[in-house]
Amino acid sequence: MRRLKVEKNMKSKIIVDSSANVYQLPDVDFACVPLKILTDEQEYVDTEEVDAPALAQMMRTYKGRTSTSCPNISDWLTAYEGADEVYVVTITGTLSGAYNAALLAGEEYEQSHEGARVFVLDSLSTGAESRLLVERLAALIKAGKPFDTVCEEIRAYHEHTHLLFALESLANLARNGRVKPAVAAVARMLGIRVIGQASDAGDLEVLCKTRGEHGALERLSLIHISEPTRHSLIS
């Protein structure tokens, strides 16, 4: 009797760290691996359940030092479990060790799971741009495209995404020694907003300064219009 060859139905999964602010993704297997926010007294895990407004208010009034902690290799491996094809998007590697940890976890996962493949993309950004990449990955997977094609097309798409942002406060930067406290205080009193972008190298860099929310939105819009070939995300 002739034997029929049965091909394994490959299970795909998209995974992102919590800097993307994406905690659920419809119609695809998805996981969000949380970063942690650390103060001198407490550790906050950045999950969907965290009270973001309360945390933001605490950060505004907190006088001590704050920092973040990225997911470790074990965290990533737990998220990869059960998938044959894994697609990962991380916060820029210039700000966090999440990308390197995800890469190392991918190598370990492929070695311990025969036939598994892991693709890790450094967003070279954070926040809204990572979300854009994740949503495009989901569309490619739902279209039934093979692993190598998905990887190739998301890299090409990434070349045309761009993050612009405005900072309402410099308080956290001052607490961590990035700017002088006096500069942060003056900026707060004058209502100065810092306009920045994620550079091609993955650094978050300052473009200009403006006053007030209206001025910040106007400047962001002008920058966006000046670069029509990019899919800009304003955060």
Question: What annotation goes with each model-predicted range?
Answer:
Residues 9-12, 18-27, 31, 35-36, ...:
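Mixed-charge interfacial surface used for oligomerization/domain docking
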Residues 42-111:
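Class I S-adenosyl-L-methionine
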Residues 83-87, 117, 226:
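Short, surface-exposed connector motifs at secondary-structure boundaries
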Residues 90, 119-120:
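A glycine-rich beta-strand to alpha-helix segment
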Residues 232-235:
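N-terminal low-complexity segments that are often proline-rich with Ser/Thr-Pro
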